[in-house]
Amino acid sequence: DATAHQIGWKSLACGLSDIASMGGVAKYAVISLGLPRRLSVEFVAELYRGIKALARKFDVEIVGGDTNSSKALVMDVAVLGFVEPEKLKLRSGAKPGDIICITGSLGGSYKSKRHLTFTPRLKEARCLVNNFRINSMIDISDGLSTDLNHIARDSDVGACIYEELIPVSKDAKGINAA
């Protein structure tokens, strides 16, 4: 089970990752909540603390939103930012011969609960677009094979990956051994 802080953190982290995947800089967020009446004030305060903690880390300003009553917890997070036209990276930009790179180890997020507190790769993405000729990027939150397929399809290219070169998290090792 996720804590309120983790839920808040992850809700903003997903939007920040989308900005990072295009080479952008996140600036603002709008947070809208549908809150069941059964939730405590403490839960909601901790939810906002999770959002604010990540917003502070990346200098993102919460500029608005809405709060309503609902039967279930509903969160809608919109992140706004900017990217210089020459640094904009789309999933449709891959070219034959491009090298496929990732910025961290894969797998094990469920076991380690890392998926609840991951840090968006905004700094890494900006470093890449500022220092290298990058043709395409994507947030691989849906998994390497699924998201690599999105790039290949949208760019009309193929892809070849070498399993032995994929960095696998220690938390993922042995999961499928059973």
Residue ranges of predicted features:
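Active-site cofactor/substrate anionic-group-binding motifs, chiefly glycine-
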Residues: D1-M22
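Glycine-/charge-enriched secondary-structure boundary and capping motifs
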Residues: A2-T3, P36-V63, K71-L73, N130, ...
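Short, conserved glycine- and acidic-residue-centered signature motifs
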Residues: G8, L12, V44, G93, ...
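Conserved G/P- and acidic residue-centered "switch" motifs that form tight phosphate/ATP-binding loops
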Residues: G23, D139
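Glycine-rich anion-binding loops of enzyme active sites
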Residues: V25-Y110
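Short, compositionally biased
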Residues: G108-A125, V129
